[in-house]
């Protein structure tokens, strides 16, 4: 009997990125189910699964090697480690070959860079189900991949992925325009109520319970929702993580420059405020690399905060005041493209918020 067999061997454990948002290791789609297994897990225990169709592979950040068995024949997949990492399959039912006869069985082997057009081309032309998942789009696939196509469209139009990020940011702002307008109008009302809120704080300064009740009564009377300012931020959190995912996993973003000192949008801003952005001949350690773009992002966030009403709670107000500085430090190691997106998102938000609140001020005077 003849049994179809295929195997991918990795001789030693590679250097992997080690980031939770990216899978590097064994990867397969078996009967429509995505299977991802880490190297260290397979060293401890082998993986076995029987399927009717799919593919078997080993995936790096930017590369994939895979074997696709012939469709219509059941096969067993095994990931194991015996001094080498092995991903293999073998058909479960043999084909009898008689004397002076032959059979033909076609399997496909793909070793490719994870460029989206290449991977999607293989998936479509070879009819490989879910082969596009070899690029780790994440659980927000339905946002991440369309967002990449939007970026790629503007890249082809404008010739620079940094400009494409800005263009997509404008489109996102336009998409959320009605929600943002509602939020800014509510915050504008909150700002106009500041004198009355100050009066209530003075009146009930010794009784926090009565102050809270008076505040809630004021909000109800003026039809103001103090939490409405959070809505635009909450809605855009998935977009933020989708941008992060795209910049981290797609080969198209690797070594793509922006204007000025940004030579790779997928890497952090290489400048540092601690050596005056290169004017002092000193290379600070990585934790001190707070570059120009993170600082620009922090400044835009600080200015944007000034357009918002001051929180009634003094402790909350202090936390909000230091929040831009906190985010500047947190986002400094992130991809420059992500920080550029957040900076321009802040700028467009400020413009919209200023226009809405200016109109409200004119109406009340």
Model regions and ranges:
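Soluble non-transmembrane domains of integral membrane proteins
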Residues: 1-129
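Membrane-interface amphipathic helices and adjacent TM-edge segments
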Residues: 100, 174-240, 249, 300-332, ...
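Short, membrane-interfacial amphipathic segments enriched in basic
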Residues: 132-145, 202-209
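Hydrophobic alpha-helical segments of integral membrane proteins
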Residues: 136-158, 193, 215, 261-262, ...
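Transmembrane helix interruption/hinge and helix-loop junction motifs
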Residues: 158-161, 329-339
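Conserved catalytic motifs of ABC-family nucleotide-binding domains
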Residues: 245-298
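Hydrophobic core segments of alpha-helical transmembrane domains in multi-pass membrane proteins
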Residues: 294, 337-346
